[in-house]
UniProtKB/Swiss-Prot annotation:
One annotated GO biological process: glycine decarboxylation via glycine cleavage system
UniProt-recorded name of the protein: Glycine cleavage system H protein
List of residues that carry N6-lipoyllysine: 65
GO cellular component terms, A-Z: cytosol; glycine cleavage complex
Assembly notes: The glycine cleavage system is composed of four proteins: P, T, L and H.
Biological source species: Azoarcus sp. (strain BH72)
Family designation: Belongs to the GcvH family.
Xref: Pfam families: GCV_H
Length: 127
């Protein structure tokens, strides 16, 4: 059974989103996603300053099984990326919720209302 923290938001494409006090968003992949992928061996993250649209493929995660796109949960500007996970991609498997990938400044703060809560994501992955 996958871990699904209640204090995060989620997408149907298996990204988790933490709403920070300053209005920015921290993005990573869910425990469910890392378990399905298997051993993560490579990450390609967006550069700071990149402007992304909601749902745009903006990063790549590769495992021994597959390569998958990571999507921007909302429109905005990438303000930081976690280079420590590119140096140690296995950290995503060790703790998917500590191994954040990038931070976004949303173009519109209200855009997060379309994201799933923990119960909604649990229902989504139960199918």
């Amino acid at each position: 059974m996958s871990t699904i923290p209640n204090d995060l938001k989620y997408t149907k494409s298996h990204e988790w989103i933490r709403l920070e006090a300053d209005g920015t968003l921290t993005v990573g992949v869910t425990d469910h996603a890392q378990a399905a992928l298997g051993d993560v061996v490579f990450l390609e993250l967006p550069e700071a300053g990149r402007v992304v649209s909601a749902g745009e493929a903006c990063a790549v995660i590769e495992s021994v099984k597959a390569a998958s796109d990571i999507y921007a949960p909302v429109a905005g500007e990438v303000i930081a990326r976690n280079d420590s996970v590119t140096d140690a991609p296995e950290s995503v498997n060790a703790d998917a919720y500590a191994a954040w990938l990038f931070k976004l400044k949303p173009a519109n703060a209200g855009d997060t209302s379309a994201l799933l809560d923990a119960a909604g994501y649990a229902t989504e992955i139960a199918d």
